[in-house]
Amino acid sequence: MTPNQKDGPRSNQEIRVPCIQLINDEGQNQGIVSTQEALAMAANIGLDLVEIVPNAEPPVCKIVDLGKLKYQNQKKAAETRKKQKIIEIKEIKLRPNVDVHDYGVKLKAIHRFIEHGNKVKITLRFRGREMAHQDLGVKLLERMKEDVSEIAKIESEPKLENRQMMMVIAPKS
């Protein structure tokens, strides 16, 4: 953005075209009028002349309170930002020889994360000689897949990287 350029629509003296399509402060179309005449009308009411559609021929301008317009635009932008849900990836770490109760606790945590709309990365770590029994890890992740199949879909199938096996699940849409 160049230094003389500002954000937002052009207003008042920044509108440099000779004629404009005017919409008054009550929202009624006044037709094509000269820019000077429109500026005088806006000044009489104590409001601003703001360019709404700059690419039209002639440009469409409206008589409004510029401060109020900017405030409403900021509120709209804040509202849309607030509505956007940031999806987090939560991680659950397991070992191949996990106990029944521990498995249940991890499963409850996964259910909670999925219900909140988060993705879950399930990491199965192998230590030492456990690498010789990777089939146990595959069985465990397959069991996990079946247990969460009603509430989640598999985003990435179990895959082995170095000494750990990973799988990512996401909420069903």
Curated annotation (Swiss-Prot):
Protein name as annotated: Translation initiation factor IF-3
GO molecular function annotation: ribosome binding; translation initiation factor activity
Predominant place of localization: cytoplasm
Role played: IF-3 binds to the 30S ribosomal subunit and shifts the equilibrium between 70S ribosomes and their 50S and 30S subunits in favor of the free subunits, thus enhancing the availability of 30S subunits on which protein synthesis initiation begins.
Superkingdom, taxonomy of origin: Bacteria
InterPro entries the record matches: T_IF-3_C_sf, T_IF-3_N_sf, Translation_initiation_fac_3, Translation_initiation_fac_3_C, Translation_initiation_fac_3_N
SUPFAM superfamilies: Translation initiation factor IF3, C-terminal domain, Translation initiation factor IF3, N-terminal domain
Subcellular location: Cytoplasm
Keyword list, A-Z: Cytoplasm, Initiation factor, Protein biosynthesis
GO CC terms, sorted: cytosol; membrane
Family indicated by similarity: Belongs to the IF-3 family.
Biological process per Gene Ontology, one example term: ribosome disassembly
